[in-house]
Amino acid sequence: MTHDKKNAKIIPFPHLKDRLVEKGMSSLKEKKYQEALELFSEAMKYDDTESDLHLGMAICFLELGELEEAESVCEKMLKEGYGHYFTVLQVYMTILIQLKKYEEVKSTIEAVLEENQLPAESAEQFYKLLDFSRKMTDPDREDEAWAEEYEDTIDTEKVLASPEEQMNLIHSLKDRNVAKYTGLLKTILQDPSAHPIIKTMIVMLLAEHEYSKPVHISKFGESLTIEPSEIVPPDAAPILHRVLRVLDETLGNENPTLYAAVEELWRRHLYVLYPFQPKLLSADLWAAALHKVGYEMHGIEIESEELHMMYEFTDRELDEACTMLKDIEEISYL
């Protein structure tokens, strides 16, 4: 009898793995990274082939500062083809940069470029990472000397003409006095051709430095005057959390994985708009639009009537909101 018990096969509760994944995604959404990691690890015992599990673990490791573990998970995903390749690759590049493995960043992106695999929406971001990694692996480069040289030899015309140079300028000013460059930064903010994300980064930079003078911004054909030190950061915008609360009651309960994806979409949308706010301010409307666009992105159809059962909106405004989400998403990466 003892022998039989010892060798009996343990049968898990039905759908236990799915419940563990859902709880893990919920904890990840709430930024409870250690709790999420433990749930994902437990789910792995039942099925170690699900891409969401691997990516969720990689993100948890990254947020917990366990970079080598995060690196290992991403390498396995890329090698075995788990998940969306370029989503995983972007996370992997982020990890390598934090590990200061610039040579690996350079060689990896160069290999991808040789195969002409980069999707158009990701190309610019990867080219910037490649250029950055090449600079960081330059044998003649010395960190402090390079930073000082950049500051002393800045070419205003070159900066105004190049998003890459604008990014370099912003990063170089993170821990420096911005006073010398506020004129240039303000010029970029009013330049119709400057990328909206660059403008967001400049406003946030000025806010971090508690810059309190009026700043004029042009974005998406609109103009706005703000005092950077007084504005609310995009991740604290009331519309962000009002929409997510509504969406959590519907999509969050129905499909936590998809909820996490559209939450990130909504955060990116507001980040690109910042410091502007959406013209339409109905939380129900934006929750419905995110629900619909999220389904479409994953190849799922949902009828307007079904959305009307969960949210209050007009069809005309829903179409407008969905178009806005898609248009902003197309330019939401540098």
From Swiss-Prot:
Keyword Repeat attached: yes
Keyword Cytoplasm: no
Coiled-coil positions: none
Residues in TPR repeats: 17-50, 52-84, 195-230
InterPro entries given in the database record: TPR-like_helical_dom_sf, TPR_rpt
Origin: domain of life: Bacteria
Originating species: Bacillus subtilis (strain 168)
Name the UniProt record assigns to this protein: TPR repeat-containing protein YsoA
Keywords for this protein: Repeat, TPR repeat
